[in-house]
Amino acid sequence: MDFESHIEKIRDKRHWWTTVDTERYSWNDIMHLVDTHPNDEYDWNRDKQRLGMNSFHRRPSAPQFAKDIFKDMEDFFVSRAPAKSHSEYEKGPPQITNIAFCGFGKYTGSYPRHKDSMDVFLVQVIGDTPIRIGYTEKRTENDEDRIMKPGDAVWIPRNTWHQLTPVASRVTFSFGFESDSDCDPSTFI
């Protein structure tokens, strides 16, 4: 993923859209990923009919595009992040985390409108999922509403309000740049 070409929006803390070649990833592929994922890295939410697979990029069965995004984010963000001594970190050293969200059925849920303390790169892999992105806690006419389709991806800067409202089975990959608040990419990229 070419994060360099979006550097101004990253510095301005604005969300931006792109596409990712998801290699026509199928439900059979995702079920193989589910079946080969370690149980201790499952995050099953029964109320939301959703399975999360933490650190899924490490699986041999993970798609190459996900492994590439993880590496590209490490190279672009983690390698450029200001260094501190280990004892100075509140959350620990900057890192890339990821989770594959698999929602099953038309009542699959997500989180209510929220903001994350990390920067998020979200990739829609299977199914269509409505998303709303805004810059205030309450919904306004300035919010952006879209339906994410397979291959759609969006950069959501930390502290940006957003909400996915799934309406059918779906797979969404989430990659996060996690760091202390004083290590916001807008300040060092």
Where are these regions (language model features)?
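Active-site region of the double-stranded beta-helix
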Residues: S5-E8, D35-D152, T160-I189
